[in-house]
């Protein structure tokens, strides 16, 4: 399990609205060691950018992505630095409430909900730290590139992950 935080900016929407700010999320990874230095597996994450600063509270931009990963790692004592990439797919969900009240059950007229699938390429670099026989703490940084037919999807930006994994 890994928790993450990062910064997203930019927007692909017809409203000239540029969502930006801190994003937070959770996800996980499973890896299979194929050699002394090469691993493959899969990972998946949710990341949410709350937009209550610019829009009505409850507005958000969510990213979900998952895919197949491959990474190259080294062992240096109890440290396992690695670098690799994940290739897969995901969905961006944008909910923009430009005016109104998110705490009532009344219909809001100036609200937008949009979902956009994307092809995901996610290069990353990180380090696992062995703290026991089967437990490792991990720190990782990435930059998710969400690609659609029209080009690179936004918002995008870096994320830092902290978490733990079990190893054999």
Predicted regions mapped to residue ranges:
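Transmembrane beta-strands of outer-membrane beta-barrel proteins
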Residues: 1-6, 43-45, 84-88, 140-142
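Short glycine/proline- and aromatic-enriched beta-strand/turn motifs that initiate or cap beta-hairpins
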Residues: 1-34, 39-43, 159, 163-168
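Short, surface-exposed tryptophan/glycine-enriched loops
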Residues: 126
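C-terminal/domain-terminus segments
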Residues: 140-167
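Extracytoplasmic loops and strand-loop junctions of Gram-negative outer membrane beta-barrel proteins
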Residues: 9-13, 52-53, 105-111, 145
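Gram-negative (and chloroplast) outer-membrane scaffold detector with strong preference
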Residues: 29-105, 119-121, 129-135, 165-168
